[in-house]
Regions:
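Negatively charged
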Residues: 2-120
């Protein structure tokens, strides 16, 4: 699923609730460059086997909030640039994020100038 929607600059909303992601290990840069994306539903993503999440939301500058509290990050080793330049992002729930195995979180929140709180 790496780069799956990369550069889809006209994409405004996306519902991927029915995607089967049980065996996916790499979701890096999946939505990178989707600068018009305002609504994203990935609430049912199974991320149990994911190791690479780097840049998944990189450049999603129109997203204001989304909930990742069902994301299982136990096996993730790379989260670099995950929310890079998500300049409209105001709230983010990362309460369930386990970063014990993460080696790279560089620039994870770079350019998130509107981010005000971590929903708890």
């Amino acid at each position: 699923m790496y780069n799956m929607f990369y550069g889809c600059t006209s994409l405004k909303e996306l519902n991927l609730n029915n995607f089967n992601t049980n065996n996916v290990t790499n979701i890096g840069y999946m939505f990178s460059g989707c600068s018009s994306l305002k609504e994203l539903n990935i609430n049912n993503f199974n991320t149990n086997n994911v190791k690479y999440m780097g840049g998944i939301f990189n450049g999603c500058s129109s997203l204001k909030e989304f909930n990742l509290n069902k994301f299982n990050t136990n096996n993730v080793t790379d989260m670099n640039c995950m929310f890079f330049e998500c300049s409209s992002l105001k709230e983010l729930n990362l309460n369930n994020f386990n970063t014990n195995n993460v080696n790279d979180m560089g620039c994870m929140f770079h350019g998130c100038s509107s981010l005000k709180k971590n929903k708890s």
